[in-house]
Amino acid sequence: MDSQVIQIAGPGGAPYQLGQPMLMFTGGLFLGRVDPVHLDERGTEVHLGNFTPTSVAHDEPRNVGALLFYEACAHIARHHPQVLLISFASSRPMPGIGDPAHQAAARVAALERIGASDIQVTPVQSGLITVSGTWAYNERNLRDLHVALEEQRAIFRSVPIGRGDRWTGWLERLRRVLLPVARG
C-alpha cells in the first residue's frame, strides 16, 4: 500500500534507511523530520525520536500527528520487515488540539487505534505530557494500522496538507458567487 499523501526519505532525499533521520514530505512540501531514529543492535527494534515540524506542518489547522505517525510505522513495516517492535515517546505541543491533557488523550487514542501496548502517560515539568508506548509487528496490529492509516489518508487527500487556505479561499469565492443568487 503506497502512500498518496506522505513520502518518507532519508537525508538528501535518498531512500530511507533505518537509523537515519526520517524526512517526511507531501508533494514537494517538507513537513519535518523524525530524529533520532534509534535501531537496536539486532536490527529488530526501532525507537522513533522527536518529530520536528516545519512551518507547513506546524501551521496546518488539522492535526497531522496521527497521519505522520501511522505513515512512519507503515513505512518501517513495509520496507523493513525485520523490525518487530517500534517504540516512541512524544510530548511536542499540538496546536489547535487544546490543553496538554487533551493532546495526550488524542495521542493515546491514536496509539490504541493501531494496537500499541505499554502506553504510558507521564507529566513533565514544563507542563507538557509525554505519551509513550510500543507497537509490535503482528497480523492484527498491521491490519489495524492499515485501516487507521487509510482513514487518515482519506482526510488529507481531498485537501492536501499546507493547502487548507486554498480550500478556504475556494469556499469563500463560491459563497460570494452563490450569495447574490440566493438574495435575488
Language-model segments: residues:
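Non-catalytic substrate-recognition and accessory regions of acyl/acetyltransferase enzymes
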Residues: 1-60, 67, 71-184
